[in-house]
Amino acid sequence: MKRLIVYFHYDPLGQIDTACRVAVEAMAHYGEVFFISNGTLRPADRAWAASVTLTCRERENKGLDVGAYKEALAVIGRGRLARYDELVLMNFTLAGPVCSLASMFAAMEARPELAFWGLTRHYAMKSRRFGGRSGEVPEHLQSHFLAVRAPLLHSEDFWQYWQKMPLPKSYEESIANHETRFTAHFANLGCRWDSYVDTKDLRDVFVNPIMACPRELLANRGCPFFKRRSFFTPYADELRRTDGTAARTLYDYVKQETNYPVDLLLAALLQRQPLEMLARELHWQYVLPDAAPVEPAPELAAQGLALLHLPISEVEKADSVTAWYTREAARRADEALAQAAALFAKEPMLGVLSPAVPLWSAARQSRDADWQAARPALQGKVNVPLGQNPPPAPACGWALVRLAAVAGSDTLPAITAPEDAWLLPLKAQQNGFFSASFTTAAQSAAAADQLALHYQQAADPKAVAKQFGRLVKHKLKK
């Protein structure tokens, strides 16, 4: 089967990261690749794309993936496309493959009755955001990987679909006008379709299996790709549809059970996503055993580490309970220094580590307030995006730092102002390192019990009303 692959790429820095390169090189074994990027590539990246693909085209960042596909088809032309038996439209939001693609292409080539097929499907749901005027999202193949075959590929219907397609101005318009429409549009014309990954048994469980249970799809259903967005999707959205562990179990599986360079993907994401989003999805928090014997203080300098004590902020001091818990957390952290230092040997990408924020609610509120106060001064000092919420470290006036992550030498950057402490995790992120916190087993158990209590109270109207009353009373006192 002669196959053409249109690979859509976008990166605000003009880079083609490792995840894109691995995907393109793997797909190039199964067809000719037309690489199209919404933006200007760096010279080295442009040279790489030109060396491994049939065509490399750069365009204005307009119309998202739909705009790129539409332009690619116009450039290729109907006559040239007539030479191919199958067209694959694929975009950079997929990472992988974690296994050979031979099984997928062989399985789908054995199904000549299909006019088009895709990697995965999304099940029907109601959505004002993505459902357009009707608010209904039908079951559909997901647009991150769509394969269209002759004779549909060469038909007037296919070309009219793209010629009449308006350029979307937003992600929501792209989903509503193309992804959720493509499958139904051609199915209504009598075309047969299917997804390679079989998730029919999950129809009543998850509407979007590749995001909700990616490890299951990779480990047990032969899916060769996963979504890079798994590692930075808003965590509140995850909790509305899953138990919140999908990203971490995906990461552990890919790292431990495959040869895919997932840490290189993570390093690229650290340059482009807020640290706190990655930290929440990947649960960069370690639990140290309570009963572990106190070990001698490690030789930190020999490990390329440094211990940094930071003063308690004025906001933390304002609440006496917060100040007490913060001082206690710092004191206990000193006792666990050897265990904390050992984590750096285990995790080569770990840059900054600190005790977890105390479970006392005012402590977290104080830390959030400190971050918001420091955030304006941090803008422009680092070349990574700043999230609305603080990174996991530093906290509790204590941080263990990998010198190479924050300084690139054997000296620490000077800390002369409160915002300088926040620069530690941000500089580490800029250099490709993540930050994390550690907690005791007792704190971890207490956090689980607190969560259970919050769920219980959230389901009780009386408890909600009581909490609302307390909040109003507290605000009035201020």
Which residues fall in each region the model found?
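ER/Golgi luminal nucleotide-sugar-dependent glycosyltransferases, focusing on the catalytic module
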Residues: M1-K478
